[in-house]
């Protein structure tokens, strides 16, 4: 949709990290990388409100590329992080 394309172009997509807590106290902390969108007023739009539209309008590859790019930048500055990123099936099936 136009709203999603605008958010990508205007850099209103963000990558948030949610800790994945280990069952044992020792060990490495892992994080799930989650995409969030800010609307034109700066309010957070949760994925349930925009991911279906992104799938329907063919924007998931752009969102996934954003998430991967941001995650790689983050890992470049914080190599000790361990990240999990959810990607769409369409992105994984698309050969480039």
Where are these regions (language model features)?
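Bacterial c-di-GMP phosphodiesterase EAL domain
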Residues: 1-96
């Amino acid at each position: 949709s136009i709203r999603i394309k605008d958010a990508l172009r205007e850099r209103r997509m963000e990558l948030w990290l949610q800790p994945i807590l280990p069952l044992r106290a020792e060990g490495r902390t892992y994080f799930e990388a989650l995409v969030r969108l800010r609307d034109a007023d700066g309010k957070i739009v949760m994925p349930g409100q925009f991911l279906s539209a992104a799938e329907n309008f063919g924007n998931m590859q752009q969102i996934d590329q954003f998430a991967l790019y941001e995650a790689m930048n983050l890992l470049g500055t914080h190599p000790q992080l361990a990240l999990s990123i959810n990607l769409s099936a369409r992105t994984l099936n698309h050969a480039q």
